[in-house]
Amino acid sequence: MKRTFQPSTIKRARTHGFRARMATKNGRAVLSRRRAKGRKRLAI
């Protein structure tokens, strides 16, 4: 059985990156929540 986590920086950025978050309404909500919480890093 292969391991489920096969790291790829491109895939990571495209699904969890800042521009991906900004693309949808819910993604922007995620960023605003993280800003409100005071996260040092908003996205990957």
Swiss-Prot record:
<dbReference type="Pfam" id="PF00468">
    <property type="entry name" value="Ribosomal_L34"/>
</dbReference>
<dbReference type="InterPro" id="IPR020939">
    <property type="entry name" value="Ribosomal_bL34_CS"/>
</dbReference>
<protein>
    <recommendedName>
        <fullName>Large ribosomal subunit protein bL34</fullName>
    </recommendedName>
</protein>
<dbReference type="GO" id="GO:0003735">
    <property type="term" value="F:structural constituent of ribosome"/>
</dbReference>
<dbReference type="InterPro" id="IPR000271">
    <property type="entry name" value="Ribosomal_bL34"/>
</dbReference>
<dbReference type="GO" id="GO:1990904">
    <property type="term" value="C:ribonucleoprotein complex"/>
</dbReference>
<keyword id="KW-0687">Ribonucleoprotein</keyword>
<dbReference type="GO" id="GO:0005840">
    <property type="term" value="C:ribosome"/>
</dbReference>
<comment type="similarity">
    <text>Belongs to the bacterial ribosomal protein bL34 family.</text>
</comment>
<keyword id="KW-0689">Ribosomal protein</keyword>
<dbReference type="GO" id="GO:0006412">
    <property type="term" value="P:translation"/>
</dbReference>
